[in-house]
């Protein structure tokens, strides 16, 4: 007769094994491989959405969920309360849950009557917790004790915990917490970007060398701890190797051990990883970080060494397994005790497999399938014919950002306007340098690197006047910051600035909209930028890492590529407007998170203006005309910026307009107040602040943007759920509720499938990262979010912490995803990508793009298509 141990270990643990084969590697390779468990974390000023599991996509979503539950006790499936709330709102169709359960049962092997199993599963899927009275009952615990031999064999665990996590000092403090305290301190010192006027000594030599010089003087360490590090190696790699050796970590366990340390502070480790990817000087920074961390761990735990078992043993808990059959399977304790060992083994093995993760996985999939079905019905009921379209009066290209969807919908209803969706950097791989700035900012998705630098230029005299005004403004800020950071002047600063800042506090608090508008207009007047041009022509400057401007071929190529990507190669309107987007908020560390994700946390207006300027160049139009893309003479390209917080369109580039273009411009201007009113009303009514009809939506939106006490100026990209790639006619009359990324695509102009592949590789990846950033911050806010905005501390100019000694918080704040303390606003669904194209196009894409195919197969994104006849297919 097969024992219960063999049933559980052979049949069940196969599902749980998420380990990856680890071959012997040198230390550089080990650290690089271990870095898969964290994601790069951008500084908050250039906040870029990232999904925290980007290095783990070779494993399935389910495997990563199981592994994180074992490794860090982190749940990445929606909680029971989220699921119950979604079901109550009609967001989950019960039939999808039942079909999902049937498929799962069909895939399992068990020797229990199907009806009995289904009854157990149906009860368990109610997601009720087992009663504590049952779990603690003496009778149940006695039954479990009779089967205690099961616990002699622990579960296989692919995660090696840091040695410090198993040890407590005499005060009862876990040594891993003490280690984290030290590491946070050293990370803040080294990474500090603007927080102090005194920098870390020897910082230019790298983190490890700087730490090595100072650690012997650290008063926070005991004399014995400092003595361990007294003659410690000066080379980070040697030190890391030695520390691992003295801790007794075997060669086969090294990568798992390094992963455990990276996951201990994923925020600081993520920032270190990001820095290591930015320059060759810091490319070994992650090794240095681990060398510092594990060297300090050795110093702290050495008095306690050796410890017998460094692996986290997660023994099989028999009590809840028996309790689950008693509570959900209607089996009495008497009946259980009368069962044979084989019957008990079968029931326990099944209960172990049908664990909480599986139950919540089935609910998540039902939630996602319900959303897909609802989207399918919206699209199929609203499709319009694409033939014989009249020439639109104006065409406006917006970013794919979900916040563009309501604005576009209301705009199209109010006039003969056609809108397009395109990535907000408009296909221009540029670093932008605004007028008078010595620095440049990559203005493209963070997954790409800039290939050109574009500088803003103006008349020399105008430039001098502008610089003088700007210098006055910057000198005030610089003086304030210097006084604030200096030991002596910081004592005087409150006396000097108190009256002015006190007045600002009062006025900002009680009349935020008026004061904010006044200050904004005052600043705009003082720093009025003169008319500018761009350095569009190619210049080879040896001082710059990337060339300035474009060659003629590059100008034509970028314009052609963007126009073809959205299918705009004919029937041009008299006015074509490229609309970047930006946000507007006050006293908001996360301001960059509300900007354009396609522009690396910056506004998209600069790119829009550059692209529109390129489209108006005669040389570009002539070259495009020779290729069959004929832009009429009366068609003028302009640029604007969609202000998402107030839903307004701000014009930033209006060249001389033709008569028909002027008519189009006037028409847009005439409807814009109504568009703003409708879009603002729709958006504001979703905020928890409003329960009744809003009298003046635009006025309220401006108050939200200017109020420095407002913790939620807008929802950002919350509730994003789908990325629709196709012609606008597919979704034109659909109310997509601001939940869909929209990218125009015409498969008839993409014979090779290359355009579709580019959309998936670029905007598709950006949308997926944004989606999973919101997902992670919702389902595991304590680990992947950043807590409550009101208690955050901006630290080192890099990011936020809770208090002064927490991890650098990697995700979105509570206010970005939660409606209230108990109710989420964001629906944690994995991104559904819908492509309007024949089936063969999707097959070609999946066959040629291994990375995307892996994402789909492993459950990181969902994929559906709509063929030319309107038939929907799930892939």
From Swiss-Prot:
Its cofactor is Zn(2+). One of its GO terms (cellular component) is plasma membrane. It is a peripheral membrane protein. InterPro entries: DabA. Its main location: membrane. The keyword Zinc applies. The keyword Disulfide bond does not apply. One of its GO terms (molecular function) is zinc ion binding. Part of an energy-coupled inorganic carbon pump. This is Probable inorganic carbon transporter subunit DabA. It comes from Bacillus thuringiensis (strain Al Hakam).
